[in-house]
From Swiss-Prot:
Gene it is expressed from: rbcL
Function recorded in the entry: RuBisCO catalyzes two reactions: the carboxylation of D-ribulose 1,5-bisphosphate, the primary event in carbon dioxide fixation, as well as the oxidative fragmentation of the pentose substrate in the photorespiration process. Both reactions occur simultaneously and in competition at the same active site.
Cofactor: record remark: Binds 1 Mg(2+) ion per subunit.
Stated name of the protein: Ribulose bisphosphate carboxylase large chain
Cofactor dependence: Mg(2+)
GO CC term (a single one): chloroplast
Residues annotated with N6-carboxylysine modification: 192
Entries under InterPro entries matching the protein: RuBisCO, RuBisCo_large_chain_AS, RuBisCO_lsu_C, RuBisCO_lsu_C_sf, RuBisCO_lsu_fd_N, RuBisCO_lsu_N_sf, RuBisCO_lsuI
Binding site for substrate: 114, 164, 168, 286, 318, 370
N6,N6,N6-trimethyllysine: residues bearing it: 5
Species this protein is from: Bixa orellana
EC number: 4.1.1.39
Length: 466
């Protein structure tokens, strides 16, 4: 075999191609690379491209049997990270043919697989991915999307309200159902299974599904509004998960739930297909995300996990609350919130968006703000997230001194007051506390909630309107 030369050669000779013009069909990745001391950035970037595509550590005879130029990943641009020593953003282009159609699992196995244990790198983080329409079109995506969900629920022009039922573990099915009923009757749109409520000895899944369905129908009959409870179908096997989803459909409930990272993308995509085929909405919880996305220099940013979920399928996903966080973090959160909801998102490095993303007609996902929020946060949340969001108050509903239903009333009154104020042209950023105070004058439930959680010392600037 002519021209085969055994031995180890530098990656950059093959995989670093600064002159490469990216194709519209390429999947593009932005990696934050921290090379080991003495490893030049070109070699590190090329190593990432090689190890996440066609390369291996030594030249192999079988390379001659295929066209490497057609299939290899290419590191096409490298830039140093401002303010960091020896850290670079390396841009890698992958040819479309490297990935199985409609499989987030396969995409991640390549792009964030073995390469993350690579010795020449001290650390590696995937910051963003550009998914080309040629690839995204091979996915079903979210079962229904934002507009279809609004039509199913007949709720328009405001964020939706939810509540995670607490204590998350230990209630019997009957008491759990009662807690759901109280919240829904009080004015919430949804109640939620906690992510770790699956099927434990104190409450088996089937009993919970039954009592929660009863709660939904009773609350619907009393309020004249459509209600839902996120029934967590997450299970130890895919078969068991599907069995739970089927039972939910038989009960006629509107929505089920899945923990997509612990459950896995393969299970999630199967469930999303079932949900579209059977008219179920799908709520997604991101338990385990911080294991992957919390380190600044290693792992994968949540915006990548969010894009992956939009491909795999989900109608709601937890996306942080922004409230009380730093300004920069707000921009970055809103960056991936837009990636979840919008059709077309421009590249904007100040919001952490490394690539222009065109989803074409893939349905959007509703971001869910949940965790440590209460009535005083309502103006900020309405302003930051806008109408296409779900605001979830667990303790902020169930912690009300008069009980669950009054807690739900307080949240609904606060929300309606904020939406009305916004529609009248008032500035929620500056008048938020005032709006809540006014509303509490004619709602004793809200007044009691305001008293418990007192005004929070939280001044937030109006967002830059572009």
């Amino acid at each position: 075999f002519v021209g085969f030369k055994a031995g180890v050669k530098e990656y950059k000779l093959t995989y670093y191609t600064p002159d490469y013009e990216t194709k519209d069909t390429d999947i593009l990745a932005a990696f934050r690379v921290t090379p080991q001391p003495g490893v030049p950035p070109e070699e590190a970037g090329a190593a990432v491209a090689a190890e996440s595509s066609t390369g291996t550590w030594t030249a192999v005879w079988t390379d001659g049997l295929t066209s490497l130029d057609r299939y290899k990943g290419r590191c096409y641009h490298i830039e140093p990270v401002a303010g960091e020593e020896n850290q670079y953003i390396c841009y890698v282009a992958y040819p479309l043919d490297l990935f199985e159609e409609g499989s987030v699992t396969n995409m991640f196995t390549s792009i964030v697989g073995n390469v993350f244990g690579f010795k020449a790198l001290r650390a590696l983080r995937l910051e963003d991915l550009r998914i080309p329409p040629a690839y995204s079109k091979t996915f079903q995506g979210p079962p229904h999307g934002i507009q279809v969900e609004r039509d199913k629920l007949n709720k328009y022009g405001r964020p939706l309200l939810g509540c995670t039922i607490k204590p998350k573990l230990g209630l019997s099915a009957k008491n759990y159902g009662r807690a759901c009923y109280e919240c829904l009757r009080g004015g919430l749109d949804f109640t939620k299974d906690d992510e770790n409520v699956n099927s434990q000895p104190f409450m088996r899944w089937r009993d919970r599904f039954l009592f929660c369905a009863e709660a939904i129908y009773k609350a619907q009959a009393e309020t004249g509004e459509i209600k839902g409870h996120y029934l967590n179908a997450t299970a130890g096997t895919c078969e068991e998960m599907m069995k739970r989803a089927v039972f939910a459909r038989e009960l006629g409930v509107p929505i089920v739930m899945h923990d997509y990272l612990t459950g896995g993308f393969t299970a999630n995509t199967s469930l999303a297909h079932y949900c579209r085929d059977n008219g179920l909405l799908l709520h997604i919880h991101r338990a385990m995300h911080a294991v992957i996305d919390r380190q600044k220099n290693h792992g994968m940013h949540f915006r990548v996990l969010a894009k992956a979920l939009r491909l795999s399928g989900g109608d709601h996903i937890h996306a942080g609350t922004v409230v009380g966080k730093l300004e920069g973090e707000r921009d970055i959160t809103l960056g991936f919130v837009d990636l979840l909801r919008d059709d077309f998102i421009e590249k904007d490095r100040s919001r952490g968006i490394y690539f222009t993303q065109d989803w074409v007609s893939l349905p959007g996902v509703i971001p869910v703000a949940s965790g440590g929020i209460h009535v005083w946060h309502m103006p900020a949340l309405t302003e930051i997230f806008g109408d296409d969001s779900v605001l979830q108050f667990g303790g902020g509903t169930l912690g009300h001194p008069w009980g669950n239903a009054p807690g739900a009333v307080a949240n609904r009154v606060a929300l309606e007051a904020c939406v009305q104020a916004r529609n009248e042209g008032r500035d929620l950023a500056r008048e938020g506390n005032e709006i809540i105070r006014e509303a509490s004058k004619w709602s004793p439930e809200l007044a009691a909630a305001c008293e418990v959680w007192k005004e929070i010392k939280f001044e937030f600037e109006a967002m830059d309107t572009l």
